[in-house]
Regions:
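C-terminal structured "cap/appendage" subdomains that terminate the fold
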Residues: 432, 741-744, 865-867, 872-904
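Beta-strand-rich binding/interaction modules
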Residues: 366-368, 485, 875-881
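Bacterial N-terminal signal peptides
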Residues: 7-17
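N-terminal secretory signal peptides that target proteins for export/translocation
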Residues: 1-2
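C-type cytochrome heme c attachment motif
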Residues: 425, 449, 521, 805-819, ...
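Sec-exported extracytoplasmic/periplasmic mature domains
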Residues: 137, 609, 632, 650, ...
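Long, ordered, helix-rich scaffold segments
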Residues: 446, 453-807, 824, 831, ...
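Beta-propeller domains with acidic blade repeats across secreted/periplasmic ectodomains
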Residues: 21-472, 487, 491-494, 818-821, ...
């Protein structure tokens, strides 16, 4: 929950004090406490409170002014500012590198912690759930006047008002389209083309409660619904559309809560995403990609489907499930927020193509230089900017939340957004807060800061922008600010053919990303296809990739070859009017670049394949042949490429399988090549079940391949698949037997419901709910009058690590520490070394004071009086609960009388374990070495 984090990001600065309580509380982290990755750069304060308050998001306009969305009114504090939240404008009028002027553009009661701001010339787009609002500053005075200016809601229907898992900011892509995303609170909206999108998930944003401003439905109620584009989209999602709100196209889905996206000049989309367990990520988003947070129908959480032995990162992003995209850089706990891509900036050549991602949970802005890696990207992370280089994090949910809050100034840097300014400098917005998480606002000062990162001695200069002339509009395409380029795109498009000479000059630039910006506009000018054909022969991979994307969008607009069949045969000599996949001169499916071939595969998703009524196939054969050739070029390793092949035939996997098997498969499934085994797993149609059963039962195959065969069967919903799994469960081979039984229990009431599995499991002796023996497991309540441990006194004791190692063996029954222990409670490896000593001690003395997210216990009371305490692994029928020591029990639902939250920790307190002060000091000393 990012804004939950951001507003408890807004933990009150009032608790942050200097040694002398009479001194005023600090209002920002001084630049001297920051560490930059490049010693040639410097950081300075560009603006600070009271010029702005609680910044959630920011943007820059063509004049170099910075516009900020404020989040003062949030959840419990939604009436803090009765007039509503503000969009604030800040300006450096004298060019000294510091803002000296600020004013309110708009303030209204409807604005309650808006999550996005985008400025495109005189249009100001504000993301305020349930609406996407466009304010048009008609008189261009940067002050909204209802009598003169315009306010329009162009999209509405996003759930989660005053909740950060909802609508986020708009950014303009290199194609002039508006890109935006929303978290997994759900959405039902109709675009200006009349298409309705219904996007639900397994997430309940209000935990069964109602909330003011809700739309009258819960995302669980619409999970699995088909949208008018013919696809099922779930969870958090990203989209693009025309500036008027028409032509919405979903770019990816099944996120948890991606805060923002950034789009390169080539059209590559990067995003970050989070969850409270340690599996936050930064990733490349392929068109149509499924991130995997929920099940494919959006009805089950990843926790329910987590397989035995899977790590959190693997299970959360379903990296062992067919149909999910590569998860990218999964870096652990955190709460990622704003993201930006700097193709060029004032930072210089060595920082070209710099991807920046804010991580307030770690007091850091991450940096990456994405490198093509097959059909995807390699993302090597580093701390571009941090106040916590030692990684001793506090105040974040992933390391204990409120119990870990300290007053150390360097821990209060909480970046909420990052961007490249119109002057080329990097700007970072900061909440300045000791806490991240908790759906709470605690900041009494409502503080906020904007920092500037630039070369030492940098003198800001904002290039003058003149969109009124073709030459001026084309020149503005070189701007370092993404939405200034967006305004330039619209202006160039409006100038039409008059801009062609200036665009042709831009096409000759030595930098590929500059050339790419011109290519996107070619499709709006005369002779577009002929010019694009020439560019498809360019030696630069990114230019060919961009050109193919432009061609796809061109045909999507004109309707030929993608969304409907093209009537006629245009493959004759000299004509290039047919659909792109039939152009003989555009051999995209044999392109040497895996990224170009990936894009070609993604484009096939929308091609009509079926034969029409009069027997003509309208390029069906061309599309099918392209798919075969693309599959033949899969190297058997590249997961990004593999997923693109699956997306190419989404909804027609069986047809794709039959097309490929003659040339890539083998009649004997034990002789399959790695390439075909992976493709078959990704497509897993009904006709593959028998072959995968053979592979699952073959001890000659590696264990990983046998388990993959089981997964391929499981993700097939047919009766044949369920019966095959029953046969595997009856096998004597323990490896597949145990996993097959797990799959049967997991699927019997969802994907395989209706196949009679309950009776089959009973008659075959695999699972009979009437014969299940259950054991009571009760965690005793701590004593009402606790032993008076004094944390300050405990912290003074010298601990003995050797004695602590012996005492810690008791921890291994519930916790993982290094290579020892059970994965029941939170993994303690490295945890204590990152925490202040008093935090470590308190977690042992008072474990219920702050329970780690994801480890809240439940109490099951059975009809026979048996009580079981533990963590719910599956809340279906049967209920699966894991108790102390990792004991896992399968509980038939009809035997449960009551199920309720435990309300306290599943861990015994130090007093209950009979630990004295010295033993506490010893075990804390030991844990801090691990």
């Amino acid at each position: 929950m990012i804004f939950a984090r951001l507003t408890a990001l807004a933990a009150f600065a009032g608790i942050v004090s200097v040694a002398n309580s009479a001194d005023p509380a600090p209002t920002h982290v001084p630049p001297s406490l920051f560490k930059l990755s490049d010693p040639d750069l410097e950081i300075s304060v560009w603006a600070a409170s009271p010029m702005l308050k609680n910044p959630t998001n920011m943007d820059t306009d063509q004049h170099g002014r910075i516009w900020v969305a404020e989040g003062v009114n949030y959840r419990s504090q939604s009436k803090h500012q009765p007039a509503g939240d503000r969009i604030v404008v800040l300006e450096d009028t004298d060019g000294d590198g510091k803002a000296d002027k600020s004013w309110t553009f708009v303030q209204e009661p409807f604005l309650l912690a808006p999550m996005g701001i985008c400025v495109i010339d005189n249009k100001v787009i504000v993301s305020m759930t349930p609406d996407l609002i466009v304010y048009t500053d008609v008189n261009r005075n940067a002050k909204f006047d209802p009598g003169v200016d315009k306010r329009e809601v162009i999209l509405s229907g996003f759930n989660g008002r005053i909740h950060d898992h909802s609508l986020h900011s708009v950014t303009v892509g290199p194609d002039g389209q508006w890109y935006w995303n929303a978290g997994n609170s759900g959405a039902q909206f109709t675009d200006k083309s009349g298409k309705t999108f219904r996007i639900g998930s397994a997430y309940d944003p209000y935990y069964g409660r109602t909330n003011p401003g809700d739309l009258g439905w819960n995302p669980r109620e619409i999970a699995g619904s088909k949208s008018d584009d013919g696809f099922v989209w779930i969870g958090g999602f990203a989209a693009r559309m025309n500036p008027d709100g028409s032509g919405v196209r979903i770019l990816g889905h099944n996120f948890r809560n991606s805060y923002e996206q950034t789009v390169t000049s080539f059209g590559d989309v990067f995003q970050n995403d989070n969850d409270d367990p340690p599996a936050c990520r930064v990733a490349f988003l392929p068109e149509g990609g499924n991130a995997g947070f929920c099940s494919a129908d959006g009805k089950r959480s990843w926790q329910v489907d987590r397989r035995p032995g899977q790590s959190v990162a693997t299970a959360q992003w379903r990296q062992e499930d067919p149909g999910t995209m590569p998860s990218g850089d999964v870096y652990g706990g955190g709460s990622p927020t704003g993201i930006a891509f700097a193709e060029e900036s004032a930072l210089g050549e060595k920082h070209r193509n710099l991807l920046l991602s804010c991580e307030p949970g770690r007091n850091t802005v991450f940096g990456y230089y994405p490198k093509p890696d097959g059909a995807g990207f390699k993302l090597e992370r580093f701390d571009f900017l941090t106040t916590n280089p030692e990684g001793k994090f506090v105040g974040s949910d992933f390391i204990g939340g409120a119990t870990t809050v300290t007053r150390e100034l360097h821990t209060l840097f909480r970046p909420s957004d990052v961007m490249v300014g119109a002057d080329g400098a990097i700007y970072v917005a900061d909440w300045f807060d000791p806490r991240v998480g908790g759906h709470a606002t605690m900041d009494e000062t409502l503080g906020g800061t904007i920092y500037r990162i630039a070369p030492k001695g940098f003198k800001p200069t904002v290039p003058k922008v003149d969109l009124s002339t073709p030459e001026g509009a084309v020149a503005a395409l070189r701007s370092t600010a993404v939405n200034v380029r967006g305004a330039a795109f619209s202006a160039v498009k409006e100038h039409g053919s008059k801009a062609q000479p200036a665009l042709e000059k831009l096409l000759k630039d030595e930098q590929p990303h500059i050339r790419a910006r011109a290519i996107w506009l070619l499709s709006h000018l005369p002779r577009a296809k002929a010019r694009l054909l020439e560019l498809m022969a360019d030696k630069d991979d990114n230019i060919r990739l961009t050109t193919l994307r432009v061609i796809r969008q061109l045909e999507d607009r004109t309707g030929s070859g993608l969304t409907k069949p093209f009537q006629g045969d245009m493959r004759g000599a000299g004509t290039n009017d047919g659909p792109w996949y039939a152009w003989q001169s555009v051999k995209v499916w044999t392109d040497p670049s895996a990224a170009v071939r990936r894009e070609a595969a993604l484009g096939l998703r929308d091609v009509v394949w079926q034969t029409m009524g009069d027997g003509r196939n309208f390029y069906t054969q061309d599309a099918q042949q392209a798919f075969i050739v693309l599959a033949q070029r899969f190297d058997g390793k590249d997961r990004a490429y593999l997923d693109a092949l699956g997306l190419a035939v989404r909804g027609r996997e069986a047809k794709g399988y039959d097309l490929l098997k003659p040339s890539l498969g083998n009649a004997d499934p034990l002789k399959w090549s790695p390439r075909w085994a992976w493709i078959a797993w990704r497509l897993h149609p009904p006709q593959s079940v028998a072959d995968f059963k053979t592979r699952a039962l073959a001890p000659s195959l590696p264990d990983a391949e046998r388990k993959r065969a089981l997964a391929a069967i499981t993700f097939n919903h047919s009766r044949e698949a369920a019966e095959a799994m029953l046969e595997i469960a009856a096998a004597t081979d323990k490896l597949v037997k145990v996993e097959a039984i797990w799959w049967l229990l997991n699927r019997k009431d969802n994907d395989w419901a209706g196949h009679g599995l309950a009776n089959a499991l009973k008659t075959r002796g695999i699972y009979d709910p009437d014969k299940i023996q259950l054991t009571a497991v009760v965690v005793p309540e701590p004593p009402k009058v606790s032993q008076p441990f004094s944390l300050p006194d405990l912290a003074k004791l010298k601990g003995d690590t050797k004695r602590g190692a012996l005492i810690a063996t008791a921890c291994y029954t519930c916790h993982r520490v290094g290579k020892e222990g059970v994965e029941f409670g939170p993994d303690l490896t490295g945890w204590a070394s990152r925490q202040p000593l008093d935090v470590v001690l308190r977690s042992i003395v008072e474990p219920s004071a702050d329970i780690a997210h994801g480890f809240a216990g439940h109490e099951l009371t059975l009809k026979d009086g048996t009580v079981i305490h533990g963590l719910l692994l599956a809340d279906a029928d049967p209920v699966i609960i894991m108790s102390t020591g990792g004991i896992t029990q399968t509980v038939p639902k009809n035997r449960i009388k009551e199920k309720k939250p435990l309300g306290r920790s599943l861990m015994l307190s130090a007093e209950q374990m009979g630990m004295g002060p010295q033993e506490l000091a010893d075990i804390a000393a030991f844990l801090r070495t691990k």
